[in-house]
C-alpha cells in the first residue's frame, strides 16, 4: 500500500473528501518553495502535487507556465526537485507527494535511474501529462513495478470507448480534468462534473479527484461534494507569483482545504 492508498483509506474512514494542492517545485526559489511545501499539510492539504519545471509545458495555462519559468530561472532541475522532496520527507513521512510534469526530463535522466531516485526521495506517484496509455511500457508499468502509483488524467473528451484504456494501468486515483483547455482557463461547474465523475466511478474502484477551474473555497466544496476530492493549482500558484508571503499563501490554502473538507 502506498502513502496515497493509505491516505484515501484514512479519509474514507473519516467520511472526508481529499484536498490536493499543486505547487511548482522551486517557485519562486528553492528555499521559499520548501517552506511552502512543508507548510501545506498544516494548511489541510491531504496530497501534494509537486510540479516538475519544464521548458515546454503544453497543458499549463499562463499562471503555471510563469511559475515554471521562475523555477527554471532560479536553477530548478529534476535533481533539485527530488532534493526538495527529500528535504520535505525529513519532517513528514506520511503526506503523499505526486510529481506532476512531462516526460522529457524523466527520459533524459533514464527511466530506471529516475524511478530509483524518485522512490528514494519519497515520491509516491507520478502524473506525466504527455504519455498516453499507448506508451504504458515506457514509464507507467516500470513505475508500478517500482512501487509508485501512476495516475492518469481523464477529460470531458474521454468517451466510454476510450475510458477503459485510460483506467487500465492507473493506480492511486484518477485525476478528472473538469474542463477542456489549459489550467486556470475556466471555472469548473459541479453540475457538469458530477455526471462525469459518476461515469468514471462506474468503471473503476479508484477515487476520482477533480482539478482545473477550482479557485475559491466555495468551488472547492462544490466540486468535492460530487467527487472524492478537489485539486487546486493555478489559484495557489498565482498567489506565489504575486509575491505573497508563505504564511499568507498557506492561509489561503487553508480556506480551500476547509471548503473541500466541509463537502
Curated annotation (Swiss-Prot):
This protein's record includes keyword Lyase: yes
SUPFAM superfamilies associated with the record: Ribulose-phoshate binding barrel
Annotated GO CC locations: cytosol
InterPro entries registered for this protein in UniProt: Aldolase_TIM, RibuloseP-bd_barrel, Trp_synthase_alpha_AS, Trp_synthase_suA
Record field: transmembrane: none
Entry-linked Gene3D superfamilies: Aldolase class I
Keyword Amino-acid biosynthesis set for record: yes
Keyword line: Amino-acid biosynthesis, Aromatic amino acid biosynthesis, Lyase, Tryptophan biosynthesis
Family matches, as Pfam families: Trp_syntA
GO molecular function (one): tryptophan synthase activity
Active site residues per record: 49 (proton acceptor), 60 (proton acceptor)
Similarity comment: family membership: Belongs to the TrpA family.
HAMAP family: Trp_synth_alpha (MF_00131)
Function, in words: The alpha subunit is responsible for the aldol cleavage of indoleglycerol phosphate to indole and glyceraldehyde 3-phosphate.
Name of the protein in question: Tryptophan synthase alpha chain
Gene source species: Ruegeria pomeroyi (strain ATCC 700808 / DSM 15171 / DSS-3)
Name of the coding gene: trpA
Amino acid at each position: 500500500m502506498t502513502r496515497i492508498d493509505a491516505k484515501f483509506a484514512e479519509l474514507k474512514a473519516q467520511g472526508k473528501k481529499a484536498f490536493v494542492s499543486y505547487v511548482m517545485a522551486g517557485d519562486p526559489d528553492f528555499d521559499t518553495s520548501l517552506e511552502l511545501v512543508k507548510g501545506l499539510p498544516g494548511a489541510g492539504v491531504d496530497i501534494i502535487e509537486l510540479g516538475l519545471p519544464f521548458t515546454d509545458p503544453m497543458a499549463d495555462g499562463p499562471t503555471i507556465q510563469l511559475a515554471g519559468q521562475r523555477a527554471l530561472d532560479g536553477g530548478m532541475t529534476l535533481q533539485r526537485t527530488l532534493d526538495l522532496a527529500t528535504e520535505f520527507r525529513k519532517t513528514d513521512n506520511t503526506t503523499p507527494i505526486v510529481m506532476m510534469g512531462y516526460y522529457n526530463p524523466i527520459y533524459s535522466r533514464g527511466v530506471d535511474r529516475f524511478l530509483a531516485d524518485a522512490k528514494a526521495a519519497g515520491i509516491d506517484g507520478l502524473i506525466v501529462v504527455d504519455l498516453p496509455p499507448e506508451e504504458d511500457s515506457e514509464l507507467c508499468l516500470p513505475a508500478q513495478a517500482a512501487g509508485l502509483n501512476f495516475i492518469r488524467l481523464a477529460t470531458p473528451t474521454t468517451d466510454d470507448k476510450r475510458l477503459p484504456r485510460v483506467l487500465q494501468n492507473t493506480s492511486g486515483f484518477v485525476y478528472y480534468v473538469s474542463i477542456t483547455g489549459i489550467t486556470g482557463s475556466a471555472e469548473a461547474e459541479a453540475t457538469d462534473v458530477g455526471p462525469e465523475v459518476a461515469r468514471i466511478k462506474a468503471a473503476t474502484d479508484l477515487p476520482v479527484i477533480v482539478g482545473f477551474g477550482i479557485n475559491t473555497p466555495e468551488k472547492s466544496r462544490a466540486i468535492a461534494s460530487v467527487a472524492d476530492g478537489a485539486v487546486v493549482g493555478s489559484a495557489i500558484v498565482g498567489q506565489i507569483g504575486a509575491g505573497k508571503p508563505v504564511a499568507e499563501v498557506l492561509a489561503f490554502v487553508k480556506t480551500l482545504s476547509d471548503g473541500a473538507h466541509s463537502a
